Amino acid sequence: MNIKIPRIVIGGTGSGVGKTTIALALTQILRKKGLKVATFKCGPDYLDPTYHSRASQKICHNLDGWLMGKESVLNTFYQACHNVDIAIIEGMMGLFDGHSPNSEIGSTAEIAKWLASPVLVVLDTRGMARTVSAILKGLKIFDPDLNLAGAFANFTGSPSHIQLLKDASTEVPILGGLCKHSEQTFPERHLGLYSASEENVSEEKFNFWGEEGEKSLEVNSILEIANSAPEISIPVSNINTTLKRCKIGIAMDSAFHFYYEENLMRLRQAGAELVFFSPLSDSRLTDVDGLYFGGGYPEVFAPTLSKNKSLLNYIRDLSYKNIPIYAECGGLMYLSKGIKLVEGEFFPMLGLISATSIMEKKLKALGYVEVTTKKETIFGEVGLRFRGHQFRYSDLELDESNPIELVYNLRKRKSDQVSEEGYSKNSILASYIHAHWASNPNLAEGFVQSCLRK
């Protein structure tokens, strides 16, 4: 089918140039005008989408070419754009950065082409004048098939600096930008930005950037560019939602909230009713047939998680009854014997995995991976292949006296070397990998089937 939705991709010359801030400012301005805005984030990031969801008051969806493939990207875009007036897609890293230094696979540029979307690129223009024209010309001629329709000048010193840059840019129009305001930046920690739902991410900061954008962004020109986006063809999906067959508990609070919306959507389509609960504050769950623990910050909230003995005991009892439990990264840490912080303090957790989670100061793993199951799991049969991503500062110290079965063959995206991962015991499957279930539609169905057999 063909659809027409006004849209823009906000790319950048690299990370840290202010793509997120521009996207947030623009989202708030458009909502203030009465427009319904759908937001998207290119790549596997979980944190930026929390900001876009908060600004748009709609769930932000990830679009990742390598994890999802073209058909799933287009279908996710289509489904999220129902009853909206405009779509804003924030890129990742630099415009052409992705799977390989020699191709556009997995890049923002690839997503922009798949969506036939105009691109507005964000630059860090500190200490810059006429050079901005050279950079933009280079980006434009590097890939003539990309519709580079405009640019934003960020980290400028003053409104007059923005005007100077506009006058200098002859190849690509500069549609405004945001001046330096270091006191209004969003707070960060080891995995990046704080989640937008946390208390120290104030409404004041959101409002500030929206107001700054109103002063300096050429909104009418931006809307004109968005409206110029042509119709795109969306492959017809045959996915039908099955009648509710089981209930799956989803851990969702400040400690656990790293989920791809696509994964949750596929569980619903497979017939699962999702029951959200908080490992921080709930003492038990209503009757569930399975549990899903996503990633997050269990190390930050370790004292509170460890003190919630009622829920820990309740989940242990469910596990002893062989209820299927799937856990990723932070969820894996929660299933372990406990979390040892960098400072040395130890907090006991569920103890369902015979290992201890050790927090480190340095990054332990980052990047895309491809997984093949080498044994039957709660996802299904041997040989299932899927893709995922990892980003962590912790490691597992395994208990050699009580070995656990490893059920994943893991291959990093840029290597042929295979390693073992994926921790399985009875009806538990836990891993550091954040799996994207669009890479294999059988994962959601397999997990639901396991829940039905409990």
UniProtKB/Swiss-Prot annotation:
Phylogenetic classification of the source organism: Bacteria, Pseudomonadati, Spirochaetota, Spirochaetia, Leptospirales
UniProt-listed Enzyme Commission number(s): 6.3.5.11
Name of this chain's protein: Cobyrinate a,c-diamide synthase
Pathways involved: Cofactor biosynthesis; adenosylcobalamin biosynthesis; cob(II)yrinate a,c-diamide from sirohydrochlorin (anaerobic route): step 10/10
Domain statement: Comprises of two domains. The C-terminal domain contains the binding site for glutamine and catalyzes the hydrolysis of this substrate to glutamate and ammonia. The N-terminal domain is anticipated to bind ATP and cobyrinate and catalyzes the ultimate synthesis of the diamide product. The ammonia produced via the glutaminase domain is probably translocated to the adjacent domain via a molecular tunnel, where it reacts with an activated intermediate.
Residues annotated as site: Increases nucleophilicity of active site Cys: H434
Transmembrane segments: none
GO biological process: cobalamin biosynthetic process
Catalytic activity: cob(II)yrinate + 2 L-glutamine + 2 ATP + 2 H2O = cob(II)yrinate a,c diamide + 2 L-glutamate + 2 ADP + 2 phosphate + 2 H(+)
Further remark: The a and c carboxylates of cobyrinate are activated for nucleophilic attack via formation of a phosphorylated intermediate by ATP. CbiA catalyzes first the amidation of the c-carboxylate, and then that of the a-carboxylate.
GO molecular function: ATP binding; cobyrinic acid a,c-diamide synthase activity
Start and end residues of each GATase cobBQ-type domain: 247-442
Enzyme active site: C329 (nucleophile)
